[in-house]
A protein has these predicted regions:
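Conserved N-terminal phosphate-binding loop of PLP-dependent enzymes in the Aspartate aminotransferase
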Residues: 1-192
Length: 192
């Protein structure tokens, strides 16, 4: 998303893994990520230059989000849309509208919520669509797979950046995902 906008600052809510860009939120205070699944994550080894690049807000919390709205040059908002609690649809609509107005990329991290309640992501249930979407876990029915989906114009631009993986040639996850999708569709699992 930074490739697309040319801006570097990212706002997040939810848990998004152990990457430097995520842990950078705790450089100022190791409590910034406390309400995002795991408490007390240390930012040891994370470059201090990332200090003012990641900002946190809590899901469904308008007061937190007001602070995000004041950040200059925001590139992206990454949200874990649902974990324990359902999202507030009014909150999601507000975030979507804010992103549209300010040309900010909205990414839904649905690694844990995708294919739990709907065919696809939980965003389908609420009819609030991100610019990019990350799916995993249930997509492969236990096999390792993650997919990044998005608007064609964004994916085309993002393809200019380098993304790789140790297991990028491993195809069991892809095969499992295709079969999982086929079975979900064939058995109409989400129509019952």
């Amino acid at each position: 998303s930074r490739t697309i906008t040319g801006r570097e600052k990212v706002a997040i809510c939810g848990y998004h893994g152990w990457h430097d860009w995520y842990l950078a939120a705790n450089i100022k205070s190791n409590k910034n990520l406390n309400s995002h699944l795991l408490k007390g994550l240390e930012s040891y080894g994370v470059p201090k230059k990332l200090k003012n690049s990641i900002y946190t807000f809590r899901m469904n919390n308008f007061k937190d989000f007001k602070k995000i709205e004041k950040i200059k040059d925001l590139s992206t908002i990454v949200m874990e849309v649902q974990r324990e609690k359902e999202p507030d649809v009014i909150f999601l609509k507000h975030v979507r509208k804010f992103c549209n107005k300010n040309k900010i990329i909205l990414i839904f991290d649905e690694c844990t919520s995708g294919f739990r309640e709907t065919y696809g992501g939980i965003h389908m249930k609420y009819k609030i669509y991100p610019d990019m979407l990350v799916l995993g876990k249930a997509l492969g029915n236990g096999y390792p797979i993650t997919s990044v989906l998005g608007k064609k114009k964004y994916l085309k631009k993002a393809s200019k950046s380098f993304i790789s993986s140790t297991f990028w040639t491993e195809n069991s996850g892809f095969s499992a995902a295709l079969k999982t999708l086929e079975i979900i569709d064939k058995k109409k699992i989400f129509n019952s």
